[in-house]
Each structure stands twice: as structure tokens, then as C-alpha cells.
Amino acid sequence: MNKTTVGWREWASLPELGIKAIKMKVDTGARTSALHAFEVASFQRDGREWIRFSIHPFQDSDQSRECEAPVLDRRVVTDSGGHREERPVIKTLLALGGRRWPVEITLTDRDTMKFRMLLGRTAMDQLVVHPQASFLLGGNEHQP
């Protein structure tokens, strides 16, 4: 299979969540992908645990989007500062560079972080990362 070459930061979309554009850091040091989420609340639907959450897809913007997804799992994740946190895990489609594939994403508060989303190693099987490049698939620092 041909792999798509990406830079260390790219614009992507999460179509099942209604997120048309989100700037993400392609982080080979992170095992699991992470998405900024706030106002997180669990609820039951058809006998399954679901989660409702809001996100700010764009840094330094009050624009928010409310999303819902079934909870796939709950995992304890250790962040880069060594802090351990139990996070809900969802599975959703990632669209990047003309490809779409399902990825597992943990939800956490990334409000103080530079990127609203991290793409971890387990979601990179279709990618090759060029660590010195950015936005190889289009866009720039400020827009997709």
C-alpha cells in the first residue's frame, strides 16, 4: 500500500464528528491520539455508554462544536509531563490527504496546549512523517 507523506503538523477533518478542519500535531512520541474536549458528559444510549463533549476546533477561537460518540474504552494515559489520567476513548473516521480511516482517540482538556489534536503512532499506519516539514497536504499555520 502506498503511504501518504505528512509533515509534523497538518490539517485534518473528523467527518463523523462534524469537524471540517482541525490542526493536529503528528506526534510519533505519543502512542495514542488525543483530542481537546470540554463539557464532557457520559450518558446511556441503547444500553451503551456514550459521551457528549464540546471542542474548539481552532486555537484562540471561541467557536465550539458539540459532538457525541459511543465510548469504546477508558484508558489510563500518561502525558508528556508524567501525569496519569483516565480518559474516555472513542473511534471515529480521520480524513487526511484524500484518505479516510478509523482511529482511536482519547478525549482530554488540551486548552493550554498549542494543538487541539495529537495524532499518535497507532493511527499512523498509512503515513510516513517528514519531521522537518509542515502542512505538506495543504494549508498553512492559520488556515486549512
Annotate each language-model stretch with its function.
Residues 1-144:
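Pepsin/retropepsin-fold aspartyl endopeptidases
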